[in-house]
Amino acid sequence: MLQVLRVSAPCFAFVDTIGSIGVCRVVRFTTFHNTPIEVYNKKVNDGVWKRDPYQETAVKAINRLYTELESYTQPPITQDSMPAEKGSILSWISPLKKMFSRKKSPTLTSSLPVPGMPKGIYLYGDVGCGKTALMDLFYHNLPPNVTRSQRIHFHAFMMQVHRTSHDLQDRYGFEIDFIDHIASGIAKETTVLCFDELQVTDVADALLLRRLFEALMKYGVVIFITSNRAPSDLYKNGIQRESFIPCIKLLEHRLQVICLDSPNDYRRLKSKTEDTYLYPANSPEVKKALENWFLCYADEKDPAHQDEVEVFGRKIIVPKASGNVAWFTFEQLCGEPKSAADYLSLASRYHVFIVSDIPKLSIESKDLIHRFITFIDALYDTHGKLILSSEVPVQEIYPTAPSEVLSSTADPAAKGKIESHYHGAFGGIEEVFTFTRCLSRLSEMKKQSWIHSP
């Protein structure tokens, strides 16, 4: 089934949720085929971008990939026929054959690269250093012979992977290799695949990615990844991390790893802003301002009402909505368990969000801040607009440095425990790290250019 989703205004994407993985396929119309380095230099000369030696190093690597893609032909993709659906007599025989089979599955490191396949790119660096902009520079200026390309946020991609795996399991049980089938489906429609904001915090994703990346490369898919972390730092201190190490080695071996160590945070360059992040939340003036923002974006033909958004058969209640604007309190948005799929579905349904009454959170509030960060990622990726009210300035709602972590806890014994947790445990440090990235995105989303974009 094909769906049309707004990916980033004013772009649209057709999403096939069953036939393939459902990755967003954005149709690009290009007249001139300049190389990435030519486009970069023009942006610098026109004053659109600031010359940055760190970015120039990355652009040279991107241009290398462009040149290699010009002469690359992806091999034809063949896929085994589907097995009998679950419940048929054949579905009972196959497991017995597998039980007595001594044939070993090929290991990840044993598969060889496709002949002539270009080496992809893994671009990482601090928040706001321009990773996504450079990926877009590459994606929107591919060689004319590359007609099948896809770019997707990592959260959205994994959501579709899990959804497709679930559909296949319902239909065929465990009679097929889900990962290989998904990868071949993507490869049939994709030569270049761009992942934005790769991060691994879930054990299920960690174990799945190891096989998925290998399968994609086996089918000749050239991969470009952006992340805030080096491959060696992915899923650090995570559960069963030793099982993820082969995936790290694979990324380091098959992709050109580039550290974008630019000291500039381009999202925080001076820009005129409007009052969209308001505090203190309990102030009558702030409450009135939020009402005015809601009226500004509301549809007068659609009176404010409670709405519902369905995700995988579940219903998410939207407390107050009108047209393309939705209003949640922080408790309503993040107080109960919600997944990346939930937030992406909300961000696809509404273009403007008002989030009120955000409290100051302690280091122990990992679940709450994780959901908030996931929501901001979904809203940023769909270029949604955000108005919020908080107890304290937004940059203070969660600790961002060890001193803040300790000062948020009064009990000396608890401080020692938290200090140990902060420096040694995966969960606490991960939320502190990702909240720093989140603040950079929030800063960009406050700019006038973002607020007044379509």
Swiss-Prot record:
One of its GO terms (molecular function) is ATP binding. InterPro entries: ATPase_AFG1-like, P-loop_NTPase. ATP binds at G125, D126, V127, G128, C129, G130, K131, T132. Keywords: ATP-binding, Nucleotide-binding. Pfam families: AFG1_ATPase. GO terms for cellular component: cytoplasm; mitochondrion. GO terms for biological process: protein quality control for misfolded or incompletely synthesized proteins. Belongs to the AFG1 ATPase family. This is Uncharacterized protein C115.02c. It comes from Schizosaccharomyces pombe (strain 972 / ATCC 24843).
